Amino acid sequence: MPETYMEVRMEHTEGFARKAEVLVDEESLIVCDGVSTPEVRCTPGVLESVRFSYPSLEGFEWPQAVKDNPSNRVRLEHVRGWSYAGFGRVISIMPVTIDFGFLQLEDPNWSDDKSLEGKYVKVMIDRLDMGIDDGKQWPEELR
């Protein structure tokens, strides 16, 4: 995933694996807290080395995802809780990385279709997770 600096600030958390409100470059997000521990809630303030991700709870087809964003929108639209409708542009494949404006996220639904690069898509994000970035990512030779 491309390296970009963003300021992430914890505003409030209900605790580990629960709802948290964070600011990402001044954009407010509700996320699943993977930064706190079961024993200690994360205190408000700037967070270092965090990573955002989302699991794939429902499968979809990439051609439909492209059709669902005909106006080429780029944004995360809050649905409820930690769920979002993600509108963005595919910037790479294997894994598929989508630029949602202030966040670039890897989609768990991989594709090796090069024609997907540059396309605007809509994906449903059922749970936006925030955790510690331990630096472990897919090895380059497997991308």
Predicted regions and their residues:
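Structural detector for short beta-strands of small beta-barrel domains
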Residues: M1-G15, K67-V96, K122-V123
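Beta-strand/loop nucleic-acid-binding surfaces
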Residues: V24-C42, D99-G131
